[in-house]
């Protein structure tokens, strides 16, 4: 079979630097959000009664955290960073730290049964030619055992990849369903966390890219709009790499705000600070490349000075999070200095922000993270943050690995973003 069935995504070379002069302040585009009502109260007729696979109203009322698991064990390449050991390592850490329903009863809910995403769900974001091409490629993957589906890129497929990717997208959509349903009856709904793979934020509308097959967060965003009638979606992507796929999917959409923090100059070379969206979507994309060596201080500063005011001004109906754990100082694929404590702080602050701006509606989606120890400890501490419990990051983090952050460069990047986006 010819791999021409899989469309190789467009690659934009170059640094994710801070050059560029586009500025939404000059056009007063930011003022349009002041005319919008707060997204903290929505009219949604969706009920879990319409989907017997989802939790009951009482289960949702009792839960503080809902998670789903799609480990995609068949989607695996030995020695590849994005391998089948990732999600089981997280699940094992949750068990060891007593952060599962077995130990917490109704406080934590695992969404064990959910509908698989359909081709139509995927086609809300991706070209059908790509989706059907990937499905057909499964025959070749079955014969060969493993194929590469991104031209010369690193994204692989096995015979189960297509179905595994549909399941991953469905797991995220089901959490969106559950969180929105819970918010109809509570001002403090549970947070969702999709422990899924393959990851999604690099997958562009026309094809796979950077270990990613389907854009899980992007698909969930469209699902929230089209199934539940939510209008404005705020996406936070704190993976160490720019979420170019999500960026591309919504670059002209004024109702989806995409905000990415990522290491400057890292793969895939996109995410310049001057990329603020196009057409009607100009001003609803914010890219903030961080200099190598940025860590906890940098991210906490970015959160308070960039992420919070953007969300407050945009007034979303839900926050979706591309939760990549590869900015950790121990991760082998990048050069930032996040710690387990950084991820605890991010989860805690995002939960607080969601409660302030959108009635607590928030779902996290696993993206990167390739050191199994730092990945699993950081997700476990994120769970603690979402439950309102104290961090245990000090048991894992080692200050000896850290060095001074380049805060002058960080401050320059923040000021540039503030100037461009009128913050």
UniProtKB/Swiss-Prot annotation:
<dbReference type="GO" id="GO:0005829">
    <property type="term" value="C:cytosol"/>
</dbReference>
<keyword id="KW-0479">Metal-binding</keyword>
<dbReference type="GO" id="GO:0009570">
    <property type="term" value="C:chloroplast stroma"/>
</dbReference>
<keyword id="KW-0934">Plastid</keyword>
<dbReference type="InterPro" id="IPR037138">
    <property type="entry name" value="His_deacetylse_dom_sf"/>
</dbReference>
<keyword id="KW-0539">Nucleus</keyword>
<dbReference type="GO" id="GO:0048487">
    <property type="term" value="F:beta-tubulin binding"/>
</dbReference>
<feature type="active site" description="Proton donor/acceptor">
    <location>
        <position position="202"/>
    </location>
</feature>
<feature type="region of interest" description="Histone deacetylase">
    <location>
        <begin position="62"/>
        <end position="392"/>
    </location>
</feature>
<dbReference type="GO" id="GO:0043014">
    <property type="term" value="F:alpha-tubulin binding"/>
</dbReference>
<feature type="binding site">
    <location>
        <position position="239"/>
    </location>
    <ligand>
        <name>Zn(2+)</name>
    </ligand>
</feature>
<keyword id="KW-0804">Transcription</keyword>
<feature type="binding site">
    <location>
        <position position="326"/>
    </location>
    <ligand>
        <name>Zn(2+)</name>
    </ligand>
</feature>
<keyword id="KW-0156">Chromatin regulator</keyword>
<dbReference type="InterPro" id="IPR023696">
    <property type="entry name" value="Ureohydrolase_dom_sf"/>
</dbReference>
<keyword id="KW-0150">Chloroplast</keyword>
<dbReference type="Pfam" id="PF00850">
    <property type="entry name" value="Hist_deacetyl"/>
</dbReference>
<feature type="binding site">
    <location>
        <position position="241"/>
    </location>
    <ligand>
        <name>Zn(2+)</name>
    </ligand>
</feature>
<dbReference type="GO" id="GO:0033558">
    <property type="term" value="F:protein lysine deacetylase activity"/>
</dbReference>
<dbReference type="GO" id="GO:0042548">
    <property type="term" value="P:regulation of photosynthesis, light reaction"/>
</dbReference>
<dbReference type="GO" id="GO:0019213">
    <property type="term" value="F:deacetylase activity"/>
</dbReference>
<dbReference type="GO" id="GO:0008270">
    <property type="term" value="F:zinc ion binding"/>
</dbReference>
<keyword id="KW-0678">Repressor</keyword>
<dbReference type="InterPro" id="IPR000286">
    <property type="entry name" value="His_deacetylse"/>
</dbReference>
<comment type="subunit">
    <text>Interacts with PP2A2.</text>
</comment>
<keyword id="KW-0805">Transcription regulation</keyword>
<dbReference type="GO" id="GO:0030186">
    <property type="term" value="P:melatonin metabolic process"/>
</dbReference>
<dbReference type="GO" id="GO:0042903">
    <property type="term" value="F:tubulin deacetylase activity"/>
</dbReference>
<keyword id="KW-0963">Cytoplasm</keyword>
<dbReference type="GO" id="GO:0009507">
    <property type="term" value="C:chloroplast"/>
</dbReference>
<dbReference type="InterPro" id="IPR050284">
    <property type="entry name" value="HDAC_PDAC"/>
</dbReference>
<dbReference type="InterPro" id="IPR023801">
    <property type="entry name" value="His_deacetylse_dom"/>
</dbReference>
<feature type="transit peptide" description="Chloroplast">
    <location>
        <begin position="1"/>
        <end position="44"/>
    </location>
</feature>
<keyword id="KW-0496">Mitochondrion</keyword>
<dbReference type="GO" id="GO:0005634">
    <property type="term" value="C:nucleus"/>
</dbReference>
<dbReference type="GO" id="GO:0090042">
    <property type="term" value="P:tubulin deacetylation"/>
</dbReference>
<dbReference type="GO" id="GO:0141221">
    <property type="term" value="F:histone deacetylase activity, hydrolytic mechanism"/>
</dbReference>
<keyword id="KW-0378">Hydrolase</keyword>
<dbReference type="GO" id="GO:0051721">
    <property type="term" value="F:protein phosphatase 2A binding"/>
</dbReference>
<feature type="site" description="Polarizes the scissile carbonyl of the substrate">
    <location>
        <position position="370"/>
    </location>
</feature>
<protein>
    <recommendedName>
        <fullName>Histone deacetylase 14, chloroplastic</fullName>
        <ecNumber>3.5.1.-</ecNumber>
    </recommendedName>
</protein>
<keyword id="KW-0809">Transit peptide</keyword>
């Amino acid at each position: 079979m010819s791999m021409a069935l899989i469309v190789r995504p467009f690659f934009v070379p170059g640094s994710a630097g801070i050059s560029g002069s586009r500025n939404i302040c000059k056009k007063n585009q930011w003022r349009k959000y002041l005319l919008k009502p707060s997204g903290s109260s929505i009219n949604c007729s969706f009920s879990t009664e319409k989907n017997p696979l989802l939790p009951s109203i009482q289960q949702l009322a009792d839960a503080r955290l809902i998670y789903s698991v799609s480990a995609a064990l068949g989607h695996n390449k030995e020695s590849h960073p994005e391998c089948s050991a990732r999600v089981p390592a997280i699940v094992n850490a949750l068990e060891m730290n007593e952060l599962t329903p077995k130990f917490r009863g109704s406080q934590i809910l695992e969404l064990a049964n959910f509908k698989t995403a359909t081709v139509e769900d995927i086609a809300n974001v991706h070209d059908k030619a790509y989706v059907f091409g990937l499905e057909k490629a499964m025959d070749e993957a079955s014969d060969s055992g493993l194929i590469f589906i991104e031209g010369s890129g690193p994204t692989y497929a096995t015979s189960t990849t297509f179905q595994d990717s549909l399941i991953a997208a469905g797991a995220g959509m089901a959490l969106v369903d559950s969180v929105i349903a819970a918010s109809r009856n509570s001002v403090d709904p549970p947070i969702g966390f999709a422990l899924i793979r393959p990851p999604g934020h690099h997958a562009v509308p026309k094809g796979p890219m950077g270990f990613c097959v389907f854009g899980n967060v992007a698909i969930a965003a469209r699902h929230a709009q089209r199934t539940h009638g939510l209008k404005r979606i705020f996406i936070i992507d704190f993976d160490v790499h720019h979420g170019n796929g999500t960026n591309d999917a919504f670059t002209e959409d004024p109702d989806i705000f995409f905000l990415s923090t990522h290491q400057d100059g890292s793969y895939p070379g996109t995410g310049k600070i001057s990329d603020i969206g196009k057409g009607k979507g100009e001003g609803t994309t914010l890219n903030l490349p961080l200099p190598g060596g940025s860590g906890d201080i940098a991210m906490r500063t970015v959160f308070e000075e960039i992420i919070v005011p953007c969300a407050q001004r945009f007034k979303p109906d839900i926050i979706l999070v591309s939760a990549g754990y590869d900015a950790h100082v121990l991760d082998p694929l990048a050069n930032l200095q996040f710690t387990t404590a950084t991820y605890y702080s991010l989860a805690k602050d995002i939960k607080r922000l969601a409660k302030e701006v959108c009635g607590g509606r928030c779902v996290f989606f696993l993206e990167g993270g390739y050191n199994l120890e730092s990945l699993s400890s950081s997700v476990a501490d994120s769970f603690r943050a979402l439950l309102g419990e104290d961090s245990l990051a000090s048991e894992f983090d080692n200050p000896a690995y850290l060095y001074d952050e380049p805060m002058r460069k960080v401050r320059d990047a923040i000021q540039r973003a503030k100037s461009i986006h009128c913050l």
